[in-house]
């Protein structure tokens, strides 16, 4: 495993990370993949340290994998959700952060529905903070696990054509992946109806397609995104049936991509909406289960890096 230092106090986003820093995290995660596949999954690297997962939104994959990551590194892990906490009694995010800070924890993993909330919280605590997803802003560990998944299958990130398809407008996963893939030299395409693509894409270094068949031509990786109804106010698509017809991934559309193109999805999937079960469960080309596996290793790497007793810069990314 790498001994490289991570020069940031927090991991709040991918934007601003240097390619070398991304590579260091991925290289470290590689070692944890092999550890997790062994009979002895536990390593007491974080023995005596405390990790709190503070989630203001529901989560299965992210929260569970952070819990596993912390426990496999020997940390004391506490899961907190807004339901059943003082948040329901009117406590503010900052008050909650300062309360937890007084308990001398080492790492705080936060998911929050408001973009920028995690950065605000990070300015009020002494511990390391990891962004577990904030609104439509960023989800850095998802982008890192996606990158590791791609790199293990394709052997590289640079030069690959990656299509991100679906509800990009409301997706923090899409934003973090765009930042990471651009930084690592991949070519990013965004595919979706105009209503589900954000403004300002010309500044993000991506190609935009409103025709999925044209957008999938010659791609190496297809990332499908679900429609995030919980972040919508109003109707963004005419109907589920029509959306699947034009923008759902099925066997016919998959055939337009390269013969060895792989399929990814951050989950949860809406089968029959953005992806057909036939391709989602393709044992040769679907990497969806591999993404889940890589998630634990990547989050172990992030916890490892952020808790090393090394001199860190005061700036946070």
Curated annotation (Swiss-Prot):
Top EC class per UniProt? transferase
**Lineage: superkingdom:** Bacteria
What's in the GO CC field? cytosol
Task: Tell me the residue numbers annotated for binding carbamoyl phosphate.
Answer: 61-62, 111, 139, 142, 267-268
Quote the record's binding site residues for L-aspartate. Answer: 89, 172, 226
Q: What PROSITE patterns does the database record attribute to this sequence?
A: CARBAMOYLTRANSFERASE
Q: Which reaction does it catalyse?
A: carbamoyl phosphate + L-aspartate = N-carbamoyl-L-aspartate + phosphate + H(+)
For molecular function, the Gene Ontology terms on record are: amino acid binding; aspartate carbamoyltransferase activity
Please name the Pfam families in this protein's record.
OTCace (PF00185), OTCace_N (PF02729)
GO BP annotations, alphabetical order: 'de novo' pyrimidine nucleobase biosynthetic process; 'de novo' UMP biosynthetic process; amino acid metabolic process
What residue ranges carry the coiled-coil annotation?
none
What pathway does the annotation place this protein in?
Answer: Pyrimidine metabolism; UMP biosynthesis via de novo pathway; (S)-dihydroorotate from bicarbonate: step 2/3
Keywords linked to the UniProt accession: Pyrimidine biosynthesis, Transferase
Q: Does this UniProt record's set of keywords contain Repeat?
A: no
Query: Which EC numbers characterise this protein's activity in its record?
Result: 2.1.3.2
Is Transferase among the key words of this record?
yes
The family assignment reads: Belongs to the aspartate/ornithine carbamoyltransferase superfamily. ATCase family.
Main function: Catalyzes the condensation of carbamoyl phosphate and aspartate to form carbamoyl aspartate and inorganic phosphate, the committed step in the de novo pyrimidine nucleotide biosynthesis pathway.
Subunit structure of this chain's protein: Heterododecamer (2C3:3R2) of six catalytic PyrB chains organized as two trimers (C3), and six regulatory PyrI chains organized as three dimers (R2).
For this protein, the record's HAMAP family field holds: Asp_carb_tr (MF_00001)
Protein name as catalogued: Aspartate carbamoyltransferase catalytic subunit
Organism annotation: Paramagnetospirillum magneticum (strain ATCC 700264 / AMB-1)
């Amino acid at each position: 495993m790498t001994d490289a230092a991570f020069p940031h106090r927090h991991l709040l986003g991918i934007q601003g990370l240097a390619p070398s820093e991304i590579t260091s995290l991925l290289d470290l995660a590689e070692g944890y993949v092999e550890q997790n596949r062994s009979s002895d999954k536990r390593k007491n690297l974080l023995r005596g340290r405390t990790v709190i997962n503070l989630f203001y939104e529901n989560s299965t994959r992210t929260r569970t994998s952070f819990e596993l990551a912390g426990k496999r590194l020997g940390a004391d892990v506490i899961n907190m959700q807004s339901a059943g906490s003082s948040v329901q009694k009117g406590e503010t995010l900052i008050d909650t952060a300062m309360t937890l800070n007084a308990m001398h924890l080492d790492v705080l993993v936060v998911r929050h529905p408001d973009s920028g909330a995690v950065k605000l919280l990070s300015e009020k605590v002494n511990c390391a903070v990891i962004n577990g997803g904030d609104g439509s802003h960023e989800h850095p560990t998802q982008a890192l696990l996606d990158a590791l998944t791609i790199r293990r299958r394709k052997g590289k990130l640079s030069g690959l054509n990656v299509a991100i398809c679906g509800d990009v407008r409301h997706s923090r996963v899409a934003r973090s992946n765009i930042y990471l893939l651009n930084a690592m030299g991949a070519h990013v395409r965004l595919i979706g109806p105009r209503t589900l693509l954000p403004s300002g894409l010309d500044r993000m270094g991506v190609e935009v397609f409103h025709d999925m068949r044209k957008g999938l031509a010659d791609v190496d990786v297809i990332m499908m995104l679900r429609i995030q109804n919980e972040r919508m106010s109003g109707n963004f698509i005419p109907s589920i049936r029509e959306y699947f017809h034009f923008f759902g991934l099925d066997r016919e559309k998959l055939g337009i991509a390269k013969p060895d193109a792989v399929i990814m999805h951050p989950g949860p999937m809406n089968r029959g909406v953005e992806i057909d079960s036939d391709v989602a469960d393709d044992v040769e080309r679907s990497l969806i289960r591999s993404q889940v596996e890589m998630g634990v290793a990547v989050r172990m790497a992030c916890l490892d890096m952020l808790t090393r007793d090394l001199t860190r810069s005061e700036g946070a990314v």
